[in-house]
Amino acid sequence: TVLLVQPNAYPKVIQIGSALEDLQHAVDGDIEAVYPFEDSVGVICNEEGKLRGLPANRALRDEGGHIYDVIAGSFLVVGLGEEDFCSLSAEQIDKFEALFHQPEAFVRMGHSITAVPIPDSVLQARDEHRDAPKLTHSSHDDR
């Protein structure tokens, strides 16, 4: 049980295999594991996400709340076992779902990047538009 964090979406708790191919599929490419937190968790992201132009997803911040990196593309938050990745505990799921809950948009201002939370209303409107039935136009007259 891990957390999948996709761009412009709320995190999802998912079940995933621990094979390399499973992790690569989840992040759409070769994986890179980073360990930005004191907790026994890792972040698995696409190694070439920025180079491939994957959408900016979430910011990583230091203790002072300053952005030091932005993850591009989907990523996983996974538990750390003695020798490999493992499931997150319920407490870890709660903590990191809260940390990464709100999708972010990014704005470059001079030499820095600012993360702006995407309001729930914008996400809901997008989802409603995406889920709305599509109207089709007939190419002939039905009279």
Language-model features and meaning:
Residues 1-129:
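N-terminal nucleophile
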Residues 130-143:
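Non-Sec secretion/translocation targeting segments of pathogen effectors
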